[in-house]
C-alpha cells in the first residue's frame, strides 16, 4: 500500500480508503463477523483511512465501525460526516450533530469531520436542506461549529462533500478554511480534474480538484465506480437513491457511457474496476480514493491498484476523445 499526504494536514493516508457507505452495504447490513473480517483484512493490507457518516444506515455505519475498531484495538484515520436539517442556529446544530456522531463511534475525538449536505448558491426549497456558502462561512454558521469542535479537542480537521452547485463549492474552496473535500470524479465524469466541453452531459465541476490542491486541501475521491456502472456486475449497482448523486449522471446513462470505456481492460488491467481506480490515482492532487466493499475480494481488487501505475497514454488519448464528444453525443 502506498500513502499520500492529506493536503496541509500532514496526515499520511492510504491511497485506497475504506468507504463505509450504503452502496456496498457491508458496514450497514452485513453480519458483525463479516464486518470484522473485512476491516481486519483492510488494516492488514495497509488501509488506514475509513470514511463513514450518519446518513449511512441512519448511524448504523458509525456504530458498527466504532465497535469494530474498539474491539480490534485499532486506531486508523477516521472521517465522519454530518447531515444537517435547517436550523435557526446552525453552529449549535453542527456541534450537536458532531457530538452525536462521536457517541455512535465510541470516540472522544475524530480526525476529520465533514459536511455531508449538498452546497448550493441558494437554499434548496425542498425537504432536504442544502446550505449556502453564507450558511457555512458566515458568523454563527457551520464552520464556526466545526471550529468549536476543534477547540474542544473533538476534531482535528474539517471538510465537505463536493456536491451541489459548482459555483458554491468553488467559493468554499477559495475561503481557505477547509482541509479536505470529497470530489465526485470518475471515468464517466472527469470534470473535477479534467476539462470538458460546453454541452457535456454530466455536471461540470470546473476542475475543483486542482483548485482545492492550490489551497492546500486534501482530496478524497467519491463515486470512482459510478455507483457500480464501472464494475464487473453493473446490474447490481445504481445506488440507494432514485435520484442521481450528481446531475447528468443517472445510472442508465452511466451504463451507456461505461460500455464505451471497456477497452481499458487489457492484459495489464484485469477489470474495469481497477481501470477506474488507477485512473483516479493518476492525479497527484488526489489524497485517497474511497471504495465501498461488499466482501474481502473487493478489498483485494482495490488494494492491488495502489502503486500499480496509471493508464497508458494511448488509453488516455482515447478517453479524451470520448470526453471531448460527450461519449459521441457532440461533434468533435
Give names to the regions the model predicted:
Residues 58, 118-331:
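Beta/alpha (TIM)-barrel catalytic core signal, keyed to glycine-rich beta->alpha loops juxtaposed to Asp/Glu
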Residues 75-86, 114-115, 187:
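A short, structured active-site edge motif that brings together acidic residues
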Residues 93-114, 147-152:
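CE4/NodB-like, metal-dependent polysaccharide N-deacetylase domain
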Residues 6, 18, 42, 50, ...:
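Conserved, mostly hydrophobic/aromatic
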Residues 1-9, 66-70, 94-105, 168-174, ...:
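Short amphipathic alpha-helices and their capping/turn segments at secondary-structure boundaries
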Residues 11-16, 46-49, 73-76, 107-111, ...:
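Short, well-ordered coil/turn segments that N-cap beta-strands
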Residues 1-77, 95, 186:
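N-terminal binding-site loop/beta-alpha segment at the start of enzyme catalytic domains
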Residues 29-42, 90-104, 164-172, 276:
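Short, acidic/polar
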Amino acid at each position: 500500500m502506498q500513502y499520500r499526504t492529506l493536503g496541509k494536514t500532514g496526515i499520511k493516508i492510504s491511497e485506497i480508503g475504506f468507504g463505509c457507505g450504503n452502496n456496498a452495504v457491508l458496514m450497514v447490513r452485513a453480519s458483525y463477523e463479516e464486518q470484522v473480517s473485512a476491516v481486519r483484512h483492510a488494516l492488514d493490507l495497509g488501509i488506514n483511512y475509513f470514511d463513514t457518516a450518519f446518513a449511512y444506515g441512519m448511524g448504523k455505519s458509525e456504530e458498527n465501525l466504532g465497535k469494530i475498531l474498539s474491539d480490534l484495538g485499532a486506531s486508523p484515520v477516521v472521517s465522519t460526516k454530518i447531515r444537517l436539517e435547517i436550523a435557526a442556529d446552525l453552529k449549535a446544530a453542527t456541534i450537536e450533530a458532531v457530538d452525536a456522531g462521536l457517541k455512535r463511534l465510541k470516540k472522544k475525538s475524530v480526525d476529520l469531520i465533514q459536511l455531508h449536505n449538498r452546497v448550493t448558491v441558494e437554499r434548496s426549497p425542498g425537504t432536504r436542506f442544502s446550505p449556502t456558502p453564507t450558511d457555512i462561512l458566515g458568523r454563527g454558521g457551520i464552520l464556526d461549529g466545526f471550529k468549536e469542535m476543534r477547540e474542544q479537542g473533538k476534531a482535528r480537521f474539517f471538510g465537505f462533500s463536493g456536491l451541489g452547485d459548482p459555483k458554491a463549492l468553488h467559493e468554499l474552496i477559495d475561503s481557505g478554511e477547509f482541509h479536505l473535500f470529497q470530489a465526485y470524479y470518475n471515468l464517466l465524469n472527469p470534470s473535477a480534474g479534467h476539462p470538458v466541453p460546453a454541452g457535456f452531459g454530466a455536471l461540470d465541476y470546473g476542475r475543483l480538484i486542482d483548485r482545492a490542491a492550490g489551497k492546500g486541501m486534501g482530496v478524497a475521491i467519491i463515486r470512482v465506480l459510478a455507483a457500480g456502472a464501472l464494475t464487473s456486475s453493473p446490474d447490481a449497482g445504481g445506488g440507494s437513491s432514485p435520484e442521481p448523486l450528481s446531475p447528468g449522471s443517472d445510472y442508465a446513462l452511466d451504463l451507456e457511457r461505461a460500455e464505451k470505456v471497456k477497452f481499458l481492460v487489457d492484459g495489464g488491467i484485469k477489470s474495469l474496476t481497477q481501470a477506474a481506480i488507477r485512473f483516479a490515482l493518476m492525479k497527484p492532487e488526489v489524497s485517497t480514493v474511497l471504495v465501498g466493499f461488499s466482501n474481502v475480494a473487493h478489498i483485494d481488487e482495490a488494494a492491488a491498484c495502489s502503486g500499480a501505475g496509471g493508464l497508458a497514454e494511448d488509453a488516455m488519448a482515447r478517453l479524451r476523445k470520448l470526453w471531448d464528444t460527450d461519449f459521441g453525443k457532440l461533434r468533435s
